[in-house]
């Protein structure tokens, strides 16, 4: 396809190996260091791009305190080849933060406010816990269900509304680990994982080039034996069918079609459309349905046109209703999360949006797809979606 000057193109993508938050590989690595490592390595392997051209570093991060505080985008960029004359900002849309970072860069490019951006995100959930410093307003319960802030209970509600059984969820959980393990063994993640140093279980420093979160030994029987994690009386959502608490970062280089052509760079993909949408916080996991419908309409497409889909697996009980109402549940094995998802790889909040987008581009490249959708639910009732076309 030919590019228009203000088309938004993805030039490259990379991510860290995903590490367990409890005693995992990144336990002695700070969030800014993970981020700076990715940015530096991506710029190093894209030497046609002068770091001085970077307009802005836009980084997703949810819990912006401690080592993730004081604008971690700037903290990280100062430790890279990007000069001090380039800007940096940290954004949060909870789970969709780094996809929002991508959208922010894309909107700037489309309106002529810059040509080259570095985007991505990070969350070190081992160093900065999910609820650290959070103080919800009690008056919020006058406007939304009190349990809306408990993501697992919103997944229970959504699953119940859509008739999702415990066995369906367990099967989905097993699938995630099996596909992620298969992708690892077959080298499918080599294009996206940027190796970095970490510590093994014995405390030895080594280079990791694989995700330590995947459990290939996961079985249906094993998951069936787990107790409900959020609703002890009659609940169906377990730790085995929920996204893992992990540490990780992801990064993309994004630029205008004109600048890519000027530099002689062959992009991975172009953004066809973007969308966000809101839903009742009590069923926050349903957000990808309206955001994807909106994005497809903006692109003049239908779900039948889409070759591959990456849906963040916050919970199996949430993912299955979304796939059902997007009318791709019967095509899941052909189109959806072919390299597994967050149940196997984890969901470091600020990292995940760019991570699933990059994984989608990899899947499209490896399987010959043209059009892809990356979408995710967002805490407190939102969805965010990006439609990509491979160039």
From Swiss-Prot:
The keyword Protease does not apply. Catalyzes the final step of fatty acid oxidation in which acetyl-CoA is released and the CoA ester of a fatty acid two carbons shorter is formed. SUPFAM superfamilies: Thiolase-like. Belongs to the thiolase-like superfamily. Thiolase family. Coiled coil: none annotated. GO terms for molecular function: acetyl-CoA C-acyltransferase activity. NCBIfam families: AcCoA-C-Actrans, fadA, PRK08947.1. This is 3-ketoacyl-CoA thiolase. The active site is at residues 95, 347, 377. Gene3D superfamilies: 3.40.47.10. It comes from the Bacteria. Keywords: Acyltransferase, Cytoplasm, Fatty acid metabolism, Lipid degradation, Lipid metabolism, Transferase. GO terms for biological process: fatty acid beta-oxidation; phenylacetate catabolic process. Heterotetramer of two alpha chains (FadB) and two beta chains (FadA). The keyword Transferase applies. Transmembrane segments: none annotated. It catalyses: an acyl-CoA + acetyl-CoA = a 3-oxoacyl-CoA + CoA. InterPro entries: FadA, Thiolase, Thiolase-like, Thiolase-like_sf_Thiolase, Thiolase_acyl_enz_int_AS, Thiolase_C, Thiolase_CS, Thiolase_N. Its EC number is 2.3.1.16. Pathway: Lipid metabolism; fatty acid beta-oxidation. It comes from Pseudomonas entomophila (strain L48). GO terms for cellular component: cytoplasm. The lineage of its organism: Bacteria, Pseudomonadati, Pseudomonadota, Gammaproteobacteria, Pseudomonadales. It is found in: Cytoplasm.
């Amino acid at each position: 396809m030919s590019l228009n000057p203000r088309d938004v193109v993805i030039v490259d993508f990379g991510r860290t190996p995903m590490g367990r938050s409890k005693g995992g590989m990144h336990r002695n690595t700070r969030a800014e260091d993970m981020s700076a490592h990715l940015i530096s390595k991506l710029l190093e392997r894209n030497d046609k791009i002068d770091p001085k051209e970077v307009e802005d570093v836009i980084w997703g991060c949810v819990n912006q305190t401690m080592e993730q505080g004081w604008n971690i985008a700037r903290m990280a960029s100062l430790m890279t080849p990007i000069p001090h004359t380039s800007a940096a900002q940290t954004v949060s849309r909870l789970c969709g933060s780094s996809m929002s970072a991508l959208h922010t860069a894309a909107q700037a490019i489309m309106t002529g406010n810059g040509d080259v951006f570095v985007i991505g995100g990070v969350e070190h959930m081992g160093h900065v816990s999910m609820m650290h410093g959070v103080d919800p307003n009690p008056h919020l319960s006058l406007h939304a269900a009190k349990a809306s802030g408990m993501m697992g209970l919103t997944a229970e509600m959504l699953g119940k509304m859509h008739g999702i059984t415990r066995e369906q969820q367990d099967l989905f959980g097993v699938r995630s680990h099996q596909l992620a393990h298969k992708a690892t063994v077959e080298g499918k993640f080599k294009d996206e994982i940027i190796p970095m140093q970490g510590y093994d279980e014995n405390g030895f420093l080594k280079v990791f080039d694989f995700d330590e979160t995947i459990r290939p030994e996961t079985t249906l029987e094993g998951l069936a034996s787990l107790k409900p994690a959020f609703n002890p009386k009659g609940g169906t959502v377990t730790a085995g069918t929920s996204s893992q608490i992990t540490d990780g970062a992801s990064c993309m280089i994004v630029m205008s079609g004109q600048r890519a052509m000027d530099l002689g760079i062959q992009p991975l993909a172009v953004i066809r459309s973007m969308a966000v949408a809101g839903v009742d916080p009590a069923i926050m996991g349903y957000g990808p349905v309206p955001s994807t419908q909106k994005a497809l309409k903006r692109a003049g497409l239908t779900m039948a046109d889409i070759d591959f889909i990456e849906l963040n697996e916050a919970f199996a009980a949430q993912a299955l209703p979304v796939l059902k109402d997007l009318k791709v549940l019967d095509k899941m094995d052909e189109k959806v999360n072919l390299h597994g998802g967050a149940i196997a790889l984890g969901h470091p909040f600020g990292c995940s949006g760019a991570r699933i987008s990059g994984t989608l581009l990899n899947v499209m490249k490896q399987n010959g797809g043209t059009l892809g959708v990356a979408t995710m639910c967002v805490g407190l009732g939102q969805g965010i979606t990006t439609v990509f076309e491979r160039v």
